[in-house]
From Swiss-Prot:
HAMAP family, alphabetized: GatB
Role according to the record: Allows the formation of correctly charged Asn-tRNA(Asn) or Gln-tRNA(Gln) through the transamidation of misacylated Asp-tRNA(Asn) or Glu-tRNA(Gln) in organisms which lack either or both of asparaginyl-tRNA or glutaminyl-tRNA synthetases. The reaction takes place in the presence of glutamine and ATP through an activated phospho-Asp-tRNA(Asn) or phospho-Glu-tRNA(Gln).
Top-level taxonomic group: Bacteria
Organism: Thiobacillus denitrificans (strain ATCC 25259 / T1)
PANTHER family: GLUTAMYL-TRNA GLN AMIDOTRANSFERASE SUBUNIT B MITOCHONDRIAL AND PROKARYOTIC PET112-RELATED, GLUTAMYL-TRNA(GLN) AMIDOTRANSFERASE SUBUNIT B, MITOCHONDRIAL
EC number(s) per entry: 6.3.5.-
Top-tier EC class: ligase
Binding partners and assembly: Heterotrimer of A, B and C subunits.
UniProt-listed SMART domains: GatB_Yqey (SM00845)
Name of the gene this protein is made from: gatB
Keywords (A to Z) from UniProt: ATP-binding, Ligase, Nucleotide-binding, Protein biosynthesis
Listed name of the protein: Aspartyl/glutamyl-tRNA(Asn/Gln) amidotransferase subunit B
GO molecular function: asparaginyl-tRNA synthase (glutamine-hydrolyzing) activity; ATP binding; glutaminyl-tRNA synthase (glutamine-hydrolyzing) activity
Similarity comment: family membership: Belongs to the GatB/GatE family. GatB subfamily.
GO biological process: glutaminyl-tRNAGln biosynthesis via transamidation; translation
Amino acid sequence: MKWETVIGLEVHTQLATQSKIFSASSTAFGAAPNTQASAVDIALPGVLPVLNKAAVECAIKFGLAIGATLNRVNVFDRKNYFYPDLPKGYQISQLAKPIVEGGALTIVVDGVEKTIHLTRAHMEEDAGKSLHEDFHGMTGIDLNRAGTPLLEIVSEPEMRSSAEAVAYARALHTLVTWIGICDGNMQEGSFRVDANVSVRPLGQAEFGTRREIKNLNSFRFLQQAIDYEVRWQIETLEDGGRIQQATVLFDPDTGETRMMRSKEEAHDYRYFPDPDLLPVKLDEAWIDAVRTTLPELPAAMRTRFQQDYGVSAYDASVLTGSRALAAYFEAAAQQSGQPKLAANWVMGELSAALNKAELDIGESPVSAVQLGTLITRIQDGTLSGKLAKQVFEGLWEGAGDVDGIIAARGLKQMSDAGELEKIVDEVLAANQKSVEEFRAGKDKAFNALVGQVMKASRGKANPAQVNELLKAKLQ
């Protein structure tokens, strides 16, 4: 039997506000336990929540960016459950009337575009953190995270493979960091993914029983967890077993998922409107004011890069992987006037150096202006591509500016016709066997002669001129 995978993602995005969603406590990461937990956060009797306006504006910005419907009146609800890191005994969330409904993101997998629709995005507060390994025989509770503003973004179950799920998660990560509503730091828990996974016989309309994989904090783990879960569900069904709806955890060490608890439904949480919070009303003036803060979005920029700079759809997608990367490329392209060459250098030499040094584009020792100048020197014939890589290494090491490194290291390309002709004549005289082989129809002999000329010129000869001279003399 052939099976079809069905995946929907729920992503908890920590909103980039200075204070929590219902209190004035700081959201800064890494503080000593319980030093950023106010009376509201620890649920002392008599305290009341006050909604953070900045968190609402982050949600509005996201809704606008995905072309969603913004509910002009949205309501906060209490989600009731007991857990030690939830001091109130309930979490403030949104169920019936979330702030964002609908919208879509476009992903590309193996060169094929696909639109993934979103169900909703709602605001809620984060819980605290249980510290199981910090105390012998006990569990500590850190409430610094309690009350941190989250936007939970729920997709439709429209992904059919782990590759599509990862592409969607990456696109969403790019978007929320691009528009500035989340720092995207997965190691610190700013972007956490829950994957709802089920399988069904190919062609069946009805969904299978889903299991939810919780708190995946890397794209690699997301792919591994889904792949394992799909294999497990198919094997279970083919062996005559049944899938029980459940919440599971992924163990990166074993590469397996394990059951955490049976999966709850909405009625298990006894949702009801929070009486301490009034409905949030969004007027057009407020929405329009937030709209003016939106930057050019990734999809629009991809289209513009293809139209204005002539780069391919794939290159445009890579170059808009982050707002900082897109800005770097555009600055280098404008500095050099050679956008395609700039794209090749950004995605090639620069990207490799950044990955090797484990640096982000914003930490690059080579500025966009420097790279643009380097590309200009290739274009005007001062440097060959091979020599340019040596100059790039110098820029990376902080050895000076482009022209200074060229001069100091004697890297200027040899373009003097008389000087080149002399070297070519010497190479032809010393390599008569290769000359005879070329004239006998062996094209590889020509490449060998080019190599000898480049070697004799210590890599400084202009390759195009070398080719022309050799062809002229070998006719």
